[in-house]
Every structure is written in C-alpha cells, then in structure tokens.
Amino acid sequence: DRVSKILNIKYPVIQAPMLGVTTPEMVAAVSNNGGLGSLPVGGLSAEKTLALIQRTKELTDKPFAVNLFAHPIPAVVDENEFNAMQDFLSQLCTTDGIQVEQQAVDKLRFYSYKDLISTLISENIKVVSFTFGVPDDESIEILKANQAILIGTATSAEEAKILDKKGMDMITVQGIEAGGHRGS
C-alpha cells in the first residue's frame, strides 16, 4: 500500500506519539514489528531529545518518526497568573494528598521545535511528525532538504488544507473521538 511504501514499513500502522508514556522501547517494538514507531519529544531540550533518539536507535534499525509540538512558545509568562495557577493546583493536589513542588517562574524554560531541527538532521531522522500547529517555512525547507518525510496533524478540513499548502507529505486526521488531547 502507498503509506507503507512512503514510510518504508511493512504494515500501514503508525504508533501514536504519546508524550509522557511512550518510551524508546515502545517505539522500537512497533518499528521492529513492521509499523512506524513515533518518538514524542515536544517541549524537550535538544540534549534530552538526542538521548531518546540514540536510545531508540540502539533498539532498532528500522524507520521511526520523531514527533514535535509546533505551537508558539509564549514570549512572556505573567508571574501573577503563573503563581495563581500553581496555588490552585496545590489546593487540588493537597485535597488528594499529593505533594506538589512549587516552581519559580524565572526558572521556567520552554523549548521550541525549532531548537530540535539540527538534532534531527544530525541524527538523520527521516520521518518527522508535527502536532499542535504548523512548522515554519524555514524548518520545513531544512527538513525537506534532508529528505525527511513530514507528517502534520489536522483536526479540521481547514487545518488539513493549511498543512497541504505548507507541503506536508502526509496528514494525520484526528476527530473528536481521539484518545487524550487532539492535535490542534
């Protein structure tokens, strides 16, 4: 079938990139059994991303995708809003006996998918998927110049049209029945 040929896999099965629960072992297991494993790295640092990719490569020589979050990174986090959110979460957690460590707003670090492009290139990643938005033109150009297959995520016909115009090679379509969050 067309999907299997494009992705160089045996079966047209793509494992969902589930940040927080997916491990290199899961990704490799899917890829080693003929599907396309997907390694989620949205919001992670380049160093952490590199370590996860290298661990996955230790476990498989088959194709796997790396999934990035393409949402905009906030320029400024309002300290009062951040503290109010932490106080609210602390109250909720205390009710259930869960310990919560407060974070200082000035210690927050947000990583953009743009911070990871050079890592993907250096590791010769050939399938890159995106969720929570559309990558910028420069990132698309760099990845395509390195023969990466790009997969976008759409939750509406309008989003699919935008992804198509941007040059995605494939588009994952999610409906309201998607498990967990939706990719927009």
Give the location of each predicted region.
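Active-site entrance/lid segments in N-terminal catalytic domains of soluble metabolic enzymes
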Residues: D1-S184
